[in-house]
Amino acid sequence: MALGRVGLTVGLWGLLWVGVVVVLANASPGRTITVGPRGNASNAAPSVPRNRSAPRTTPTPPQPRKATKSKASTAKPAPPPKTGPPKTSSEPVRCNRHDPLARYGSRVQIRCRFPNSTRTESRLQIWRYATATDAEIGTAPSLEEVMVNVSAPPGGQLVYDSAPNRTDPHVIWAEGAGPGASPRLYSVVGPLGRQRLIIEELTLETQGMYYWVWGRTDRPSAYGTWVRVRVFRPPSLTIHPHAVLEGQPFKATCTAATYYPGNRAEFVWFEDGRRVFDPAQIHTQTQENPDGFSTVSTVTSAAVGGQGPPRTFTCQLTWHRDSVSFSRRNASGTASVLPRPTITMEFTGDHAVCTAGCVPEGVTFAWFLGDDSSPAEKVAVASQTSCGRPGTATIRSTLPVSYEQTEYICRLAGYPDGIPVLEHHGSHQPPPRDPTERQVIRAVEGAGIGVAVLVAVVLAGTAVVYLTHASSVRYRRLR
């Protein structure tokens, strides 16, 4: 019995401990839930002392969980996105090149993209404005700015219209554009909204400001942007050393031709490797032409021909394409010296004879009589002999004397440019005519006058007979 009571007591104590453990295990979740409120400022323990120097803060009550649960439980699924028109971006028109610079004669392509490129009712127009003449577009329009609801300014020429059937009949098409243009200087290729403007040949006429206008057919000026197309053309450089006579100063001329733009073309001269600093020896002039600019620079040496060896000149050209880029080229040449010829004139019988010694090959004589500025009509016979100097010869020309003129001029023709006029003046009294010759001339002149009088009499008689016959015929008809 004692052992049974002891076992019963142990069993009851074991059941009691099991019950305590179960109660503690069930009570732990409830204690975890109450941690949040106890940590809030409104439920802080009153035994904690406050610091008087610390600022007082207004407590924030906790948000009830019920509202959060209710909101989460009543949330509806997000509706699918609407399929309306797409929003316009901050850059509705985007071009890959807003300020292209290309060489003269090259082929230029400009690509631009537009919004709503899949809409078949969209319309694109491209206008061209001359850079220097049209003030309506402003001196420097913003090239990357996209304008909204701005139509093309006046004064432009139409390059392209995607809806040619809607083009104003009074519009002015650019040369090489529009229906039936041949040859075509402009073309637009690519899918709608991603067009490429192709300028077949860039010149001074095709450069300028291009205005792209994009929109719907009923609102064609929705967007617009500017593209500036500029052309450059490097100069061609040539040097021309002047041929001079003995005793003349050496000269050379350099020409920078057909370049664009005409910002600056600077020449620096060298004579036999030494720079020419004296500005009085250099003369430079720039001229604007339809195909660009040309600059001509001439240097005059202090040395003269025949007093030393020929001089070699070098011109150095520096051309500034813009404020940043420039190119530099050189050209050289040696001046030549020609002997100064000696011209003589003599009269032998019925001929005038002119002789010039040591003239360049190809030089001939031209005769002038009296005050007449045209060469003499009579044929002059020329002959040529050796002079003894390479490339030169002695020439002689004869001309029959004139019975009307007393002044004679024989002039050398065929010298290079820059050589002064070389000529000789002479006087000669006309010889007396032969009496027989004079009688023959007078007889011929008298016969000519007689023939003229006879012809006049015959014509007058014929006219009288014709008028008499016509009057008689008319009188008979009246009867």
UniProtKB/Swiss-Prot annotation:
Pfam families tied to this protein = Marek_A
Keyword annotations from UniProtKB, A to Z: Disulfide bond, Glycoprotein, Host-virus interaction, Immunoglobulin domain, Inhibition of host complement factors by virus, Membrane, Signal, Transmembrane, Transmembrane helix, Viral attachment to host adhesion receptor, Viral attachment to host cell, Viral immunoevasion, Virion, Virus entry into host cell
> What membrane topology does this protein have?
Single-pass membrane protein
Topology Cytoplasmic: residue spans = 468-479
The cross-references to InterPro entries, in alphabetical order and at most eight, read: GA_GC, Ig-like_dom, Ig-like_dom_sf, Ig-like_fold
Organism listed in the record = Human herpesvirus 2 (strain G)
Per the record, ranges on the Virion surface side are 28-446
Q: What additional remark is attached to this entry?
A: There are seven external glycoproteins in HSV-1 and 2: gH, gB, gC, gG, gD, gI, and gE.
Subunit text = Interacts with host complement component C3b; this interaction inhibits host immune response by disregulating complement cascade.
Q: Which gene encodes it?
A: gC
Gene3D superfamilies from the UniProt entry: Immunoglobulins
The entry's localization annotation reads: Virion membrane
Q: Name one GO cellular component term.
A: virion membrane
Q: What is this protein called?
A: Envelope glycoprotein C
- Is Nucleotide-binding one of the keywords? no
Stretch list, region Heparin-binding domain: 105-119
Chief localisation class: virion
Q: Which cysteines are cross-linked by disulfides?
A: C95-C112, C254-C315, C354-C410, C358-C387
Residue ranges of the TM segments: 447-467
GO BP terms: namely: adhesion receptor-mediated virion attachment to host cell; symbiont entry into host cell; symbiont-mediated suppression of host complement activation
* Similarity-based family: Belongs to the herpesviridae glycoprotein C family.
Q: Which PROSITE patterns did the record assign?
A: IG_LIKE
State its role: Major attachment protein that mediates binding of the virus to cell surface heparan sulfate or chondroitin sulfate. Also plays a role in host immune evasion by inhibiting the host complement cascade activation.
Which residues does the annotation flag as glycosylated? Answer: N40, N51, N116, N149, N165, N330
